[in-house]
Design a protein with these regions (language model features):
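Acidic/glycine-rich phosphate/pyrophosphate-binding loops and surrounding catalytic core
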Residues: 2-225, 229, 233-240, 244, ...
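Short secondary-structure boundary segments
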Residues: 249, 272, 294
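Active-site loop ensemble at the mouth of alpha/beta enzyme cores that anchors a bound cofactor
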Residues: 305-309
Length: 309
């Protein structure tokens, strides 16, 4: 930085760990998935017959063992949800993982072994797979984006473009893929975006500087980030003491000019229209951060199977 920054770069490149997630909240998500499957939760008219009518035909008290297997190369994520899901259906099943979240697996690799009540295993298998396939898809796609940046000093961040109620899981998956987490919600950073500036009548000039300065002075212990969509907004943002300047939908030449203008007076972040193909060029510009929600909202579920042993 060209001046004494209020916050180090490390402040803005954190990763959610599994222990950061609230187990009670995760149990609620699993519980919703369970009653959706067994009792038609979400339907205005609940079914008269509840439960798993197919598994009810299986031998009572039967025990079983099954293997979780990667059916294609992937970065695994969500293993902590497997035991939580089993326990939601019953107390007599065990999951023994042979991989760990964030690990890259090849086709055919074993992820873990499920054992216990056949009834519980049969009822829970689709919910388990839904979580693992989705979160592993996010982690795998994120890994591709991180790899595309290569040895660049630019740090890949996620966004708040997440499925409602699943944010912490999707951000955790992004971290498992090697990315870093942007703000978790509206509570942990002041982020003046274009609509905030429009409401404040502060899209440029002195009014823009005054609005940013008010945020910096009022929120002394909270980082202040400002989204700009023109080069002309950069100097007022710098003069007001913004901690991070988000360069929204700038072209490559504009980004290069913006980095030169900012000259280390604030941390820089590029966002908008970020693709795998553009990352190598973006990584050469000297940007501090590159943020994209694509690995979360454009990822494909990965093929994972549960096979009876």
């Amino acid at each position: 930085m060209g001046h004494e920054a209020r916050y180090s770069k490390d402040t803005f490149q954190t990763r959610l760990q599994w222990q950061d997630l609230d187990p009670d909240y995760l149990r609620q998500l699993v519980g919703l998935a369970k009653i959706e499957d067994l009792a038609g939760a979400g339907l205005a008219n609940r079914p008269e017959r509840l439960g798993d009518v197919t598994t009810a035909l299986m031998p009572e008290g039967a025990k079983g063992k099954a293997q979780l297997t990667a059916r294609e190369p992937l970065t695994i994520c969500g293993l902590g949800l497997v035991q939580t899901t089993l326990e939601s259906y019953g107390q007599n099943c065990l999951f023994e993982a042979t991989a760990e979240d964030g690990q890259s697996l090849d086709q055919g690799d074993t992820i873990g072994i499920l054992s216990g009540s056949s009834t519980v295993l049969l009822q829970a298998e689709r919910v388990i797979l839904n979580f693992l396939q989705h979160l592993s898809g996010v982690a795998t796609e994120t890994r591709l984006y991180v790899d595309a940046l290569g040895k660049s000093s630019s740090v890949l961040l996620d966004t708040r473009k997440t499925l409602p109620a699943y944010r912490v899981l999707q951000k955790y998956a992004f971290a498992c893929g090697g990315g870093y987490n942007h703000r978790i919600g509206l509570f942990d950073r002041v982020m003046l975006k274009d609509n905030h500036l429009a409401v404040a009548g502060a899209t440029g000039g002195n009014r823009l500087s005054e609005t940013i300065a008010l945020a910096v002075n009022t929120c002394e212990n909270i980082p202040v980030e400002v989204e700009v969509d023109t080069l002309e907004q950069i100097i007022p943002a710098l003069d007001a003491g913004a901690d991070i300047i988000l360069l929204d939908n700038f072209s490559l030449p504009e980004l290069k000019q913006a980095v030169s203008m900012i000259e280390g007076r604030a941390w820089t972040e590029a966002s908008g229209g970020i693709t795998l193909d553009s990352l190598s060029d973006l990584g050469d510009l000297g940007l501090d951060f590159i943020s994209t929600g694509a690995p979360i909202h454009q990822s494909r579920w990965k093929d994972i199977g549960i096979d009876w042993l």
